[in-house]
């Protein structure tokens, strides 16, 4: 009995030394609850990511495992090295960009697409190491950052509506409404409203509940075939290590690589700042602790993710749900990572999720990301026009890269045309010139 108590106290002492629980005003129990809460809000990614990457021709069972592995790796590393209550997983938006645009629309092998993700992650890692990342964040205007986030939201939302069958291709009008009486459409729409209603009532597992309910209804209608719940993890040999580094070093992919890097730069940085701010972890000068370590872990996770066969990795805003119930240290993130490792044994469940069950989650994420348009100064056209062009051109051109390019260029045009040259930072000018060169010398040929 005494030996057991000694073992427990030594274990708690180790956690105290690693995570400084008392200093942050928290306990092991609180951190465990926070980790479980964060996990419930983001576990949907293990069902949605395989669905999306499956469009690119990747083995969905293997992607399920690699999604769990990289989420576990990134979250545990964030907890141990940065001691922040922030979990990581493959980024929604960039996974859709990879599957629907880079592979499906551009006709590239998914291995080459993974290579583009790798080089984008390496670029992000170098920007972090040499502190250029902080300079770019500070010098790219809010309107462009918001336009990029919102444009990806519109792009994801469109993919969700397409996967649910709500919108379909039409040669005369480009798109038109689908068969709304089809049960797949009805279930996809139902799934979205389940998420929206539960989320508005602060139910943390809203997305997970929606996926479970719509999958069960699909099973009752004969769309889903029960294959079990628990099994040994599927093989990952079909995706792990199949990244084409040489094939992706192509001048024609420069814009794609830059897009992966730039979007991940803003996404992770914004999430890390937002979550740590909500946790009250800023110091007396308003600076956030261990941000360099956090950004480093984020970049390394994306590099690792491309090698094992999954899309760009980012910090998840869903981490704020764990913070809201008391998560203050990296122990929260470690708990999330451990739970993702346990989920690997539930691979049969992931294989049963139909496309329309995941569609509701895509539409919901689109709503969340598009809401950032409210931050644009709409009464200032030099800010509103670039934000609008960036956002709408992503879904309309079916390319996140083109949306970013036209947004940066239009920002320079508006500022130069109105004589507000002081608003143009060197960063914006350099990026805009690079995109102009891409359009003239690469896209034109």
Give, region by region, the residue ranges found by the protein language model.
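Juxtamembrane transmembrane-helix boundary signature
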Residues: 2, 71-92
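Helix-loop-helix hairpins and the membrane-proximal interhelical loops
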Residues: 2-62, 175-177, 208-292, 433-437
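Helix-loop-helix junctions within the multi-pass membrane cores of secondary transporters/permeases
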Residues: 11-45, 49, 70, 91-100, ...
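Short helix-coil transition sites and intra-membrane helix breaks within transmembrane domains
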Residues: 40-44, 81-91, 126-127, 202-203, ...
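Helix-coil boundary and interhelical linker segments in multi-pass alpha-helical membrane proteins
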Residues: 51-63, 101-112, 251-254, 354, ...
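Helix-capping/transition residues at the boundaries of transmembrane alpha-helices
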Residues: 53, 81, 198, 305, ...
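Loop-to-helix transition at the N-terminal end of transmembrane alpha-helices
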Residues: 56-76
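Membrane-embedded alpha-helical modules
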Residues: 106-216, 220, 334-445
């Amino acid at each position: 009995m005494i030996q057991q108590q000694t073992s427990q106290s030594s274990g708690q002492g180790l956690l105290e030394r690693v995570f400084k629980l008392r200093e942050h005003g928290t306990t092991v129990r609180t951190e465990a609850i926070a980790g479980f809460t964060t996990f419930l809000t983001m576990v949907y990614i293990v069902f949605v990511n395989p669905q999306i990457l499956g469009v690119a021709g990747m083995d969905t069972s293997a992607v399920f495992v690699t999604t769990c592995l990289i989420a576990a790796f990134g979250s545990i590393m964030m907890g141990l090295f940065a001691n922040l209550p922030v979990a990581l997983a493959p980024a929604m938006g960039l996974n859709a960009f990879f599957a629907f645009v880079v592979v499906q629309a551009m006709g590239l092998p998914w291995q080459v697409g993974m290579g583009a993700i790798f080089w984008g992650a390496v670029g992000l890692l170098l920007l972090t190491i040499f502190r250029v990342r902080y300079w770019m964040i500070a010098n790219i205007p809010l309107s462009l950052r918001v336009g990029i986030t919102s444009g990806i939201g519109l792009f994801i939302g469109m993919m969700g509506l397409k996967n649910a069958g709500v919108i379909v291709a039409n040669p005369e009008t480009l798109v038109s409404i689908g068969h709304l009486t089809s049960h797949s459409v009805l279930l996809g729409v139902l799934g979205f409203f389940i998420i929206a209603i539960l989320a508005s009532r602060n139910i943390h597992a809203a997305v997970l509940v929606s996926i479970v309910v719509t999958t069960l209804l699909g099973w009752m209608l004969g769309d889903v075939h029960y294959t079990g719940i628990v099994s040994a993890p599927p093989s990952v040999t079909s995706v792990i290590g199949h990244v084409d580094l040489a094939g992706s070093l192509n001048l024609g992919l420069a814009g794609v690589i830059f897009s992966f890097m730039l979007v991940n730069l803003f996404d992770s940085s914004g999430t890390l700042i937002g979550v740590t701010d909500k946790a009250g972890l800023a110091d007396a000068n308003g600076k956030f602790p261990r941000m360099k370590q956090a950004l480093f872990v984020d970049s390394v996770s994306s590099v690792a993710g491309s090698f094992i066969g999954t899309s760009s990795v980012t910090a998840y805003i869903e981490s704020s749900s764990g913070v809201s119930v008391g998560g203050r240290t990296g122990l929260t993130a470690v708990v999330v990572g451990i739970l993702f490792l346990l989920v690997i044994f539930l691979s049969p469940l992931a294989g049963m999720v139909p496309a329309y069950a995941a569609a509701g989650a895509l539409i919901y994420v689109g709503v969340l990301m598009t809401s950032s348009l409210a931050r644009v100064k709409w009464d200032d056209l030099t800010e509103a026009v670039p934000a609008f062009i960036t956002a709408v051109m992503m879904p309309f051109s079916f390319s996140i890269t083109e949306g970013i390019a036209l947004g940066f260029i239009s920002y320079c045009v508006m500022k130069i045309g109105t004589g507000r040259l002081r608003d143009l930072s060197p960063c914006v000018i350099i990026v805009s010139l690079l995109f102009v060169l891409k359009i003239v010398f690469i896209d034109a040929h």
